[in-house]
Amino acid sequence: VICASPAGIERGAILAMRYADAAIIVTNPEVSSVRDSDRIIGMLDSKTERAENGSRIDKHLLITRYDAGRAQRGEMLSIDDVLEILSTPLLGIIPESQDVLRASNVGAPVTLSNQLSGAGRAYAEAARRLQGESVAMTVPNQKRGLFDKLFGRRAA
């Protein structure tokens, strides 16, 4: 059973995690989101029924809305920064994508509405990893223009 809970640390999230055997922590590579995720991980390790009985919850991290270019410019945290802060096994990296917004607006999962999109593939790969398959991790790369490829920097 997969139960989605609200973002942040509110009553809904606390109720959802109380009897969890496993958790997928979904975070954006932004300081406030990672900070909330860190608090949730702490609660998973202390406030759940399993934690109170001395057992650990199987935790996975899903990083969404990742943009390598923005991370490179320091506008968001890098994947390594997020992993260092949260110390949780990485399930997948979902790239920032207009396909997700379009799919959401029509009420369809991006994995069905645009299976070839980077986000659609990344979600499908994360689901396969969650089921135990060994799937190579794809890290979304910054799209580079001709001048960037030739000179190794952003074109003005």
Model segments located where?
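Generic secondary-structure signature for well-ordered alpha-helical cores
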Residues: 46-49, 87, 96, 128-136
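Loop/turn-to-beta-strand initiation segments
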Residues: 1-2
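Beta-strand-loop-alpha "switch" segments that mediate conformational coupling across diverse proteins
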Residues: 82-111, 123
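NTP-binding/hydrolysis catalytic cores, primarily Walker-type P-loop NTPases
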Residues: 106-156
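Sparse recognition of residues in long alpha-helices and their boundaries
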Residues: 52-53, 98, 139
